[in-house]
Amino acid sequence: MMNYEDAKLRGQAVAILYQIGAIKFGKHILASGEETPLYVDMRLVISSPEVLQTVATLIWRLRPSFNSSLLCGVPYTALTLATSISLKYNIPMVLRRKELQNVDPSDAIKVEGLFTPGQTCLVINDMVSSGKSIIETAVALEENGLVVREALVFLDRRKEACQPLGPQGIKVSSVFTVPTLIKALIAYGKLSSGDLTLANKISEILEIES
């Protein structure tokens, strides 16, 4: 059950994300090719230290008992979130290199940082829709001897939210799903009239589908 402080932080995060234009209503196409009436652009959080720290705190609180020894943010948006968590909670971090250019394939380093094979690494991401980026990151980490069991995300866009990912069965925990984000936006009470109408329509559709 969510405590008062978590509920307050969730409300603050939704309010600021909407105010800075990170939450948008209307037709949008996701990187996965899926069409959505609700778009969340987490790239904007890097320009708002307040919302960055709030989102990072909420993500970290999904796992109050930490038993992984490393963090890795999915390139690129989640790198700032993972860094924020690493600094605040003193958890070592590794970096997955997404592009390898002008390097000898035999010397290509996919994961930067200090680590020992066999260590468990917790993956951090801003959101998950298809799960492809989390799986790719997990594969790179595992190829370097690290163990990946879990990913923490701010928003799980999947219809079957919080279901395990990939053949590894990576557990996914999220601050919001689309239905809970819509409810939080409506509860926020300061949506424009047009956005409120769309939010209510999305809420009705989600209730029918459930």
Curated annotation (Swiss-Prot):
Binding site for orotate: S129, R157
Positions bound to 5-phospho-alpha-D-ribose 1-diphosphate: R97, K98, N125, D126, M127, V128, S129, S130, G131, K132, S133
Keyword match Transferase: yes
Membrane-crossing residue ranges in chain numbering: none
Entry keywords, A to Z: Glycosyltransferase, Magnesium, Pyrimidine biosynthesis, Transferase
Catalytic reaction list: orotidine 5'-phosphate + diphosphate = orotate + 5-phospho-alpha-D-ribose 1-diphosphate
EC numbers for this chain: 2.4.2.10
Single GO BP term: pyrimidine nucleobase biosynthetic process
GO molecular function: magnesium ion binding; orotate phosphoribosyltransferase activity; orotidine-5'-phosphate decarboxylase activity
Pathway note: Pyrimidine metabolism; UMP biosynthesis via de novo pathway; UMP from orotate: step 1/2
Alphabetical list of Gene3D superfamilies matching this protein: 3.40.50.2020
Keyword Magnesium: yes
EC class of the enzyme, as a word: transferase
Requisite cofactors: Mg(2+)
Coiled-coil portions: none
Domain of life: Bacteria
Subunit structure: Homodimer.
Physiological role: Catalyzes the transfer of a ribosyl phosphate group from 5-phosphoribose 1-diphosphate to orotate, leading to the formation of orotidine monophosphate (OMP).
Similarity comment text for this entry: Belongs to the purine/pyrimidine phosphoribosyltransferase family. PyrE subfamily.
NCBIfam families, per database record: PRK13809.1 (NF010382)
Protein name, per record: Orotate phosphoribosyltransferase
